[in-house]
Structure formats: C-alpha cells, structure tokens
C-alpha cells in the first residue's frame, strides 16, 4: 500500500507527572475538556490534514487507549482507503524488548512502516492539545528539499530552558539544537512533531542499531546526528494554540482555558472538527436545586448542586448542597451531598462521600480514578 505520508503517533508514555490520573492508563487516554481524551486532538489533526493511515505506538497501560481508539470509526478511519493500527511491543527472534525511546519505537516498527510504503513519515506525540494542518508542514518540507522538518513554536524566554531549542538561520534552516539549555540562544521550541524522508530515516536507524550505536531518541540522538552529518533540517514555525498538558497544573489550566468563549482552540469551527469516541448517554438532568454558572456539562450528568466555572464530563452526578468551583470532574465521577470542591481534578469513576471538603487553593487537588473519599450514602 503506497502512502505519500504515513502518520505515526507516539502514545506509550507513562505520564508520571500526572500522578494518580495515569496510574492505570497512558497519558494520551486522559480525559480533557469534558468530552475528549488527549489523543483525540492529534488523531483529528491527522484526519483533517488528509493523513488517513495512522499507526499508534503504545506501551504503558494501553487498555483504555486501545478501547477508545477501537477501529478508528469515530475519526472516519474505518474504510478501505484509511486505517488506524495499534502498535505494541512484541517478541521477535531477539526476544521481547520495551521501547527505549522515541526513535527506538520507530525502529521496532519498521516492518509496519515498510508495509505502508510511505515517501514521508510524520511522527507525532499523542499528548498535546492543539489544532494543526500537517499538510501545510509537508508542503514546506517539499519546497525546501528538507530531509527533516521539525515543527517549532515560540515560547516565553523565561520558559525556553525547559524545551529542546532550535537555532535557525534567516532561511529557517536549523543550524544548532540544544536540549534544555541553561542559556538558550533562541526561543524556538521543538513541538515533538517531525516529518522525515522515510528512506533516509530508515537507513540511519538500521545502520545505528546494527552497529550498536543505538539512536534511541529523536531529540537526544537523531536530530543532532542529522545536523552533524550535514542533512538539510528545517524548522516549521507554528503560530497557533499548543499546550503540553504533562503536569497537573498545565492540565488544569488548559481545561480552564476551555471555558473561555474566545479560547484559541475554537471548537465551534466546523472546518476543523475535533472528533472523539463518546458513549451514548441520556440528556443531562438539571435539578430544581441546581445553580450553574460558566460551566460545561456533558450528556448523562445529573446536577442538583452548585457548579461554577467548571467542566463536568459525561455521567457525572452532583448531589444537593454540594458546591463545585474552578474544577474538572472526569467521566463517571459521583459527588455526594454537601461536598465542597475547589480548584481540583476529580478522576474517572471517583466517588466523593457526603460532607467532604477538597480544597486546591494552594495546590491543585487531585482525586485518582475510581478513588473513594469519605463515606458514601448518596444514590449511585
């Protein structure tokens, strides 16, 4: 099967900085914005950009992620000219081996990529929130004759030392790469989005692992090698909204930004939809005792308490006398009577008993998936 460009999403990360929220699932499967999961944004970007054949490389706790993606029907990837393939670590003649890094994950799946026979390979992270046209990036890649194009975004100078920084010339050619430099020379941060000419990348990876010169990571190994070897490496400047939601603070802030009617993601844009797989649920019920202000409430929820500036995912229940402010309530969570929740993230299926106070004023409070807090007496 010949593809001009194959999309490969790296979705195997543990997401340890998200703590309890990734205890039993990979970071790309974490719910976001009421009715989505983080990986939905990357998958939807692929589909909207015309990239209809996608491999999703998983590793850590893949069950929820695999179930969410399924056969790709929610993204229109279930027909003869499209498809999504889940790629997990497997045993070969050399035995089983976990992916050691981003580039190693690609190397371990060369068989799948060769079967798809792409001219270009688009390598993506499955744990960022953004909307991006990869076709425009491919157009630039072709125009410049690049061997590798790296998507970059300008970050605040005081945050640049937290990223891989690309230093470019006047033609946007990358001349130097620094991984989390103490004194950055530019603020062009790598987004972890790459377009490679597949034939050349394949050659580099095979030669490297055959000679035990393991290039396990794109940022630490492959990009520096390309630059040192004189390959044509260009930056693609991205100007839109992009969030790395790898920490509790960043995940909470990104969700709160979602409540702004003028947020940069603009999910009302019918020309660039974000698709997801959502359970069929009845309409939400707003009880007579409920008070709701500046909130997002998804289907299947029952609200009898007060909700202010918060996101409530599908099938959430909030009983009478409870007050939820500045918080994210993930799918299936149940909150009892006279509960106070402020600046918190409540995990999927969590149960909060009556009269509990969860206060994240000093630090965002987190209740894990299926965690039970307090004594429950309300109806399930």
Swiss-Prot record:
This protein's UniProt keywords: ATP-binding, Carbohydrate metabolism, Glycogen biosynthesis, Glycogen metabolism, Nucleotide-binding, Nucleotidyltransferase, Transferase
Catalysed reaction, written as an equation: alpha-D-glucose 1-phosphate + ATP + H(+) = ADP-alpha-D-glucose + diphosphate
Binding-site list for alpha-D-glucose 1-phosphate: 164, 179-180, 190
InterPro entries to which the protein is assigned, alphabetical: ADP-Glc_PPase, ADP_Glu_pyroP_CS, GlgC_bac, GlmU/GlgC-like_hexapep, NTP_transferase_dom, Nucleotide-diphossugar_trans, Trimer_LpxA-like_sf
Pfam families: Hexapep_GlmU (PF24894), NTP_transferase (PF00483)
GO terms of molecular function: ATP binding; glucose-1-phosphate adenylyltransferase activity
Database matches in PROSITE patterns: ADP_GLC_PYROPHOSPH_1, ADP_GLC_PYROPHOSPH_2, ADP_GLC_PYROPHOSPH_3
Enzyme's top EC category: transferase
GO biological process entries: glycogen biosynthetic process
Pathway listed: Glycan biosynthesis; glycogen biosynthesis
Enzyme Commission identifier(s): 2.7.7.27
Family, similarity comment: Belongs to the bacterial/plant glucose-1-phosphate adenylyltransferase family.
HAMAP family membership: GlgC (MF_00624)
Assembly and binders: Homotetramer.
The protein's role, per its UniProt record: Involved in the biosynthesis of ADP-glucose, a building block required for the elongation reactions to produce glycogen. Catalyzes the reaction between ATP and alpha-D-glucose 1-phosphate (G1P) to produce pyrophosphate and ADP-Glc.
NCBIfam families hit by this protein: glgC, PRK05293.1
Protein name: Glucose-1-phosphate adenylyltransferase
